[in-house]
Regions:
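Extracytoplasmic small-molecule ligand-binding "clamshell" domains
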Residues: 26-93
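Bacterial signal peptide processing site
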Residues: 21-23
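Beta->alpha turn/N-cap motifs
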Residues: 39, 69-73, 83-102, 110, ...
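Flexible hinge/capping segments at coil-to-helix
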Residues: 30, 124-141
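Pocket-lining segment of extracytoplasmic ligand-binding domains
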Residues: 128, 140-243
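An extracytoplasmic/periplasmic, membrane-proximal ligand-sensing/linker region
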Residues: 30-59, 240-301
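Hydrophobic/proline-rich hinge and linker segments of small-molecule sensing/allosteric domains
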Residues: 108-132, 235-236
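C-terminal motif of bacterial Sec signal peptides marking the signal peptidase cleavage site
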Residues: 15-19
Length: 301
């Protein structure tokens, strides 16, 4: 009897040891689905909206979620490559990098004001005397982030195509920051995303700081635009479970049609819906990069 008891104790101990440090099933409290957002807007707003979205996804799917907002677009891509992030809300070019480097899988394309695409814009102070793309020659430009499609890649490619050389440029850290760099006189030109006017209000990056700087629409104006770019994505890391992926996609599409969902998504990245996406939808961006002889690897920073 004593031998049986000792044997049982040993089995329990071995079982306990083998379970130490082992993660639970994905989507549980001990191993939540990790959803990362890029810092293209003010971090505090992204966190607030991201948490609201995660809370609703938990109700709709039964899975547990955890959000994070790293300090750069590239950090989100690398986290997905290392399986530290399961879902990334990735801008267009960042998605292409994630697909190229780590075979990430697109799930959804965002919709803004009924459109699945957007443009990059060049903005200047209204009284600067800069009226066209050619006038940017020799000026200082505030781009957003090295991996931002509308805030750097497309604008810099357009300048290169037209042989226009700025005196210098720097990365402001986000779309609102690039707008403020122009507004506050730290740059002659700022680059960011642009979407059409909706209900009489411009829907570009200036809107993100309109509450704090109510005269920015009059003081800062767009003078040129890039070609159209497919919208941002909701992307899943390689080998993310297919059923969970479909559950999250369906939940996000359902949530986007509710009043609470519309508010959170609008506050997050000015999103008002989603459409199912395929990797081929983004070939137009790859073709543009190829035509301009730009390597994706240049922008993984």
């Amino acid at each position: 009897m004593r031998k049986i008891m000792l044997f049982s104790v040993v089995i329990v101990i071995l079982f306990s040891i083998s379970g130490c440090g082992k993660k639970g099933e994905l989507g549980t409290e001990s191993n939540p689905i990790k959803m990362y957002f890029v810092p293209s807007m003010e971090a505090g707003k992204v966190v607030t909206s991201g948490e609201a979205i995660a809370n609703e996804l938990e109700k709709l799917t039964g899975y547990k979620f955890k959000i994070a907002v790293p300090t750069s677009y590239a950090a989100v891509i690398e986290a997905m490559g290392a399986s530290q992030a399961d879902i990334g809300w990735l801008p267009t070019f960042a998605y292409i990098l994630a697909k190229q480097k780590y075979n990430a899988e697109i799930g959804l394309t965002t919709v803004r004001y009924g459109l699945e695409s957007y443009r990059g814009q060049f903005v200047v102070k209204a009284d600067s005397g800069i009226e066209s793309l050619a006038d940017i020659e020799g000026k200082t430009i505030a781009f957003t982030d090295a991996s931002s499609t509308s805030g750097y890649i497309y604008p810099s490619a357009l300048l290169k195509k037209n042989g226009i050389e700025p005196a210098k440029y720097y990365f402001a850290g986000g779309h609102p920051q690039a707008m403020l760099a122009v507004y506050q006189g730290r740059a002659d030109v700022g680059c960011s995303y642009w979407s059409p006017v909706h209900d009489g209000v411009p829907q570009d990056a200036r809107k993100a700081v309109l509450e704090t700087y109510p005269d920015i629409m009059e003081k800062v104006k767009p003078i040129a635009f890039t070609d159209w770019i497919p919208n941002d994505t909701v992307t899943f890391r390689y080998e993310f479970p297919e059923k969970m992926k479909n559950d999250v996609i369906n939940a996000l599409m359902e949530y986007s049609q509710t009043p609470a969902g519309k508010q959170s998504l609008e506050e997050l990245y000015s999103v008002d819906g989603f459409v199912l996406a395929k990797d081929e939808d983004y070939d137009v961006v790859r073709e543009a990069l190829d035509a301009l002889d730009i390597s994706a690897e240049e922008f993984v920073k």
